Structure formats: structure tokens, C-alpha cells
Amino acid sequence: MTIERNNAMSAIQLREGVWSVGVLNPALRVFDIVMESRYGTSYNAYLVTGGEKTALIEAVHKDYFEDLVSNIEEILPVEKLDYLIMNHTEPDHSGGVRALLDRCPNLTVLCSSSAKKFLTSIANEEFPCRVVKDGDTLDLGGKTLRFISAPLLHWPDSIFTWDEADKTLFTCDFLGCHFCEPSMRDTGIHPEYRRYYEAELLNYFNCIFGPFKPAVLDGLDKMPARVELVCTSHGPTLSQSIGYVKDCYRQWAAPAVRPDGKKTVGIIYCSAYGCTRALADAAAKALTADGLQVTTLDVVFAAPETVSALVN
């Protein structure tokens, strides 16, 4: 498969000692096989420097590893990286790990215990690794990072990384969006396109976090109180939109309650010859007679996000 490269992005300084060094993929239209990405995406990574040590957060999709290296080297030689923090190990974040380990022999990886298992399989070798737990810290020299356990947001391995000095929270997929914004800032979204970003924010939530709504509420409660910048793994970083996005997530993750008090049932089916449809219709009729609110969906014609919303 030929990869269309229209991903030019330089390192962007976000705060003192914090840079965005990820890459853009504006041409992407389908993410993870089934999720539509109408406005492309970005594979975000962040460089955090202290007075003594330097950490990279995430390692992007493997097809964009050299672009990541190029962005890092606008700031420092990639071989001088001391730490790689993996908040989550899905291949769009961890694809460059093996190549980075080869390039940086003194690199130490920091991640959760489950992430260590996944990364060992991904890299197919042992590597220097420090497993971190909730509340553990990393001193970069005048800048301390604290790790926050965030399981099922959206994998068992997920953690947040909190930069107290800069009031910056690195959340990986949480609060993100498949929306390719070259400025890497929510303040850079053109006002006329804001509604598209907000629509994609909901689509992203439904497809990725819809199955984990209790974990979403826990994750929101674990966020530090004075966050000024949220650095996600996809889409623009958040500063002016932090409160808005958090409120959206809390609303979308709240248990659904019908005003009339009726319980709801979703029936999802696929029928080649109409037999399964007849069964679905019969089940819907019986459940409705019992006082339940029933919605049926034929997966052949329903959009994935519609099915996901019904299930979740």
C-alpha cells in the first residue's frame, strides 16, 4: 500500500520545556478499519525537557517514525533522549518503539505493568523498563512528572502523565479527536470549522470510549484540578476547550435515564433472507408488550457509530 505523505509538521513549543513533535495524517479517512475519520488525524508525541533529563511521550505510528525523529532533532539529537513514556501501547502510539530503542541504546521506557507485557511483544525483545504505578514520579531535573493510573481509557494499560510545573496533562487517547489541526492547538481551529471538530469529538467518543463509560467518569475525576493544557494523542491540544470537552465526556458517559422511567432494549441484527429479521421483529414486539422501549437496527444499513451508541 502506498502511503500518501502530506504530513509536514515541525516541532511546536507548547509550554516551557514542552514541545509537540508528532505528525499529521490529513488524508486518513478510515481509522482502525471501521471508524470514519472525515478530517484526517494526527499521531501526537511530546518532548518534555527538564534541567537534566529529557522524556518523549509516545512513539507514533511506525510509518511515520522518521518524521517523528526529524521533529525531535529540531530540538536535540534523538540519541540524547533519556526516557520514553508510553501512556498506552496501541500500534498508532507504539509503532516506532522498536526503531527508537535501536536508535537510542540508553533509553529507558516507563509504562504500566500491562503496557510492559504488550511492549515486550511489540518490540520482540527485552529493554530497559521502569514499571510505574499510580502516584509514581519521574524527576527530569527541576521538572517532575507524576503518573496517574487510568485503566480502560481505553486499554487496560492506559495511564496519564501530569507535569505539575507546567500544569500540563498528557492523556493519550482520552479527550482526543480524529481532527487534523496543523497548529496543534484548539485555539487554532477556524471558527467556521469548530462545528466539525465538535461533531468528530462525539464520533470519537462513541467509537472509542462508548464501551467504557464508568471508566470515563473515573478518569474525569482523576484529572488534577488546575490543568491548563491537555495534550492528547490525536487532534489538537486543549487549553480554551478543556472545560467544554470534559463536560461533553461527563454528559455522554452519564447513565441514560428516560423521563418516563421505561427500561430500554437494543436489538441489533443482520438478515440475509429475512428470517433473522423476523426473529428480531418478534422479540421487539414481545418486549414492547412487556413495557420496554425497544430499538432495532439492521447492521447492514446502520452507521457504525449508530450501532455503537445503541450498544453503549
Predicted ranges, named:
Residues 11-74, 160-163, 167-171, 276:
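Conserved beta-strand hairpin/beta-sheet module of binuclear metal-dependent hydrolase folds
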Residues 12-16, 54, 110-240:
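Metallo-beta-lactamase
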Residues 21, 171, 233, 268-270:
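Short hydrophobic segments within beta-strands
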Residues 57-59, 81-89, 109-112, 169-172, ...:
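Active-site neighborhood of phospho(di)ester-bond hydrolases with catalytic His/Asp-centered motifs
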Residues 63-110:
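Active-site metal-binding motif and surrounding structural segment of the metallo-beta-lactamase
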Residues 90-92, 116, 299-305:
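Short acidic loop-to-helix transition motifs that present clustered carboxylates
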Residues 242-312:
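N-terminal beta1-alpha1-beta2 submodule of the flavodoxin-like/Rossmannoid cofactor-binding fold
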